[in-house]
């Protein structure tokens, strides 16, 4: 006759032996066996009753029990009180006490491990609280500090962008005004150039008139000289003719005086001389008057042409001076326009560089914000994982508590006193035969989590008959 006692702990299934690290699992099974039932046959033989505890996140239990089948090898045998061997009870009690002692030692070890496990859970809870406090502090400080810095820098960037935009608009307005001034000056320059060309053409025509007048004056001077020479020649010829006539008259007068009493020719000659002199004086006076009138006309035309030429020269000099002044102004405006365009290009380049720097700063701040968000999300995931671990640990603690309460209730049950066992005479033929059937109902509940979120949950029922 032998008694078998098998005891296993869910803590070992969960965490291994004394030197094995704890690894949580999503499905946990707990098996505890103990000697609780006895069957009567030809001799008193203990049988075992197994209780299977299967825990899942919902805490479901399945039991398997062995019924007692009473059989007798010899029909009609009677069990009498005198045929019972009470020494067997002492052996059973001794072995039961040893088993209880072993169970107490194992329960003490389990209690020590459970205390260590609770200390670890408390330490993890403290770490969880510290992480939560750090997370809240990071949320508060990071949001306020980075938000204020980001807003302040964005306001400064917007202010600088607005200032640069205003400067750019002002420079563009100045550039447009300068372009309009340049266009107006160019139009004025074109008009002045046209007027200059007209003045030059007028001056050229005046020069042609002056040349013509000079030629006419020279021609008139030559004519005057020729007329003077002709007058001198005619006068000389007239004088010679007069002398010849006088000589002839004297010769005739002498001859007449000598020959006959001649008429008085002196008066006739005097009259002829007077006539010729009057005609010569008249011709000379007319020639002088014509010459003087022509000379006066030519002098007046020359003076008029000289005045026009002088005025044209003055206008040409004035136009030339205006052209030089406008050319200097155009050159100065071109230099100013080039300097303004260069400044505008430099400002555009500086604005582009500053805008690129601001964009880089904004991108860097956004990356920092994204990193902070990712870090916060990581802390939240760790916190959720810790919460899941805590929930699993709470479930295991509750399971341990139920197991301990079951063990305590089982230990507190009174033991049967075999010395006072009263056996009655029983006819084994009249006892019904009870077959031993074991029914096992197993509920498997599987929960899959990812990043602290339940993504799948399944439940399975299994009914086995043995």
From Swiss-Prot:
The modification N6-succinyllysine is found at residues 120, 129, 188, 294, 445. Residues 1-31 are annotated as: Disordered. InterPro entries: IF_conserved, IF_rod_dom, Intermed_filament_DNA-bd, Intermediate_filament. One of the most prominent phosphoproteins in various cells of mesenchymal origin. Phosphorylation is enhanced during cell division, at which time vimentin filaments are significantly reorganized. Phosphorylation by PKN1 inhibits the formation of filaments. Filament disassembly during mitosis is promoted by phosphorylation at Ser-55 as well as by nestin. Phosphorylated at Ser-56 by CDK5 during neutrophil secretion in the cytoplasm. Phosphorylated by STK33. Phosphorylated on tyrosine residues by SRMS. S-nitrosylation is induced by interferon-gamma and oxidatively-modified low-densitity lipoprotein (LDL(ox)) possibly implicating the iNOS-S100A8/9 transnitrosylase complex. Glycans are attached at residues 7, 33-34. This is Vimentin. Residues 246-268 are annotated as: Linker 12. It comes from Bos taurus. Residues 269-407 are annotated as: Coil 2. PANTHER family: GLIAL FIBRILLARY ACIDIC PROTEIN, VIMENTIN. Vimentins are class-III intermediate filaments found in various non-epithelial cells, especially mesenchymal cells. Vimentin is attached to the nucleus, endoplasmic reticulum, and mitochondria, either laterally or terminally. Plays a role in cell directional movement, orientation, cell sheet organization and Golgi complex polarization at the cell migration front. Protects SCRIB from proteasomal degradation and facilitates its localization to intermediate filaments in a cell contact-mediated manner. Residues 132-153 are annotated as: Linker 1.
